[in-house]
Amino acid sequence: MKVTFSLMQKASKQIDKFALYVPKSGVFPKGFKVATQATGVKKNGNLDLGIIRNVNTSRPSSAAAVFTTNKFKAAPVLVSKEVLEVTGGENVDAIVVNSGCANAVTGEVGLKDAREIAGVANQNLGKQNATLVMSTGVIGQRLSMDKIVPALSQQFETNAFKDDFESWLNLARAISTTDTFPKLISSNFKLANGTEYTLTGIAKGAGMICPNMATLLGFIVTDLPITPSALQKMLRSATDRSFNCISVDGDMSTNDTISMLANGAVDTAVIDENSQDFVQVQTQVTEFAQRLAQLVVRDGEGSTKFVTVNVKNALNFKDAKIIAESISNSMLVKTALYGQDANWGRILCAIGYAKLDNLQSLDDKKINVSFVATDNSEPKELKLIVDGVPQLDIDEARASELLAQQDLEVLVDLGTGSEECQFWTCDLTHEYVTINGDYRS
């Protein structure tokens, strides 16, 4: 299907994502404060430095993180990994993030710069190994330390840390690069004993997003008391079903980091892997992380559609995820969705070349593929393949209606088991090429 001028016009119309996805208020965990500043690293003068600080002293904090699998790990990734290895995740009280420069592929000098930033924060906290560092932006350039270090010191010296909504929103702004809106969510939850706690999440990312994370930074903070090992297990599981289940363009970056801090400001028993509350909190953190990860896809560079790829009835979760990932990363599928073309052949092709662990997960006589409406319109499901047989009499008018929607679900029923994976992706447009062609300029 050729992309018509009318389709290009439609894609060029800007969706007001800020109005749709940015909150106007929020609830935030006890004992955390944040600060931001425009240091001048970003050419446009926008906020480019952010700090999260734990100010609760009632008990030790815990930290956890999941990092990129890219072989060329950026300096801040290596330094943050060192901090967690040395401390075991105990008594980490701050995260310092800069945007505009990734401090990636910068060699020993990059490591020195990342350690210096952490050292400035540690000195002001009065502790060693108490700070995680993150960077995002252009790869291969050294940090402007003459701008970042004085600005970081100033935040501590002037006690610029606050805990109000606007300050948290500014933190989300400070870590943005090609993002069209700041990504901030927060929610209250209750434990079985009635104790209320809060999760706040911030993320950045709009391009170089694919499984095992990409140019993606995110952090979740909570006032629950959780042991470091339980927090790491919780975050790892949540990440596998959230940030590792999203794709914008299939590119994996050098800087991905998802971190989590728990400061124990809520007065309740410390949660470990054997606690009765562990499974409940893990489920809540996973669902929360999925909400945050979905915002990254909704901000996919140049995208016009948010697509849920739901693979169900697989032999195991891993194979369901492999197939969902294969569909989500297919350039041909993504461009067909942009062109509003019900090209089921591209979906089937992506399923067929998925590198499954167990070939019995896929039976070409059992597979079903459908488009599913995400609104209340009927018929809700448009079947494209039934028990391995392509449907030659597809209702093209209904297909056009579904593909014109901003939210769409692709449902794949493998019919070989009972496991399921949801993956989130977007279409690929002319605007994506424009944004990335002009990135450094």
Swiss-Prot record:
SUPFAM superfamilies: DmpA/ArgJ-like (SSF56266). GO terms for cellular component: mitochondrial matrix. It is found in: Mitochondrion matrix. Substrate binds at T177, K204, T215, E301, N436, S441. One of its GO terms (biological process) is ornithine biosynthetic process. Its EC number is 2.3.1.35, 2.3.1.1. Pfam families: ArgJ. The record marks T136, G137 as: Involved in the stabilization of negative charge on the oxyanion by the formation of the oxyanion hole. Keywords: Acyltransferase, Amino-acid biosynthesis, Arginine biosynthesis, Autocatalytic cleavage, Mitochondrion, Multifunctional enzyme, Transferase. Belongs to the ArgJ family. This protein may be expected to contain an N-terminal transit peptide but none has been predicted. Catalyzes two activities which are involved in the cyclic version of arginine biosynthesis: the synthesis of acetylglutamate from glutamate and acetyl-CoA, and of ornithine by transacetylation between acetylornithine and glutamate. This is Arginine biosynthesis bifunctional protein ArgJ, mitochondrial. The lineage of its organism: Eukaryota, Fungi, Dikarya, Ascomycota, Saccharomycotina.
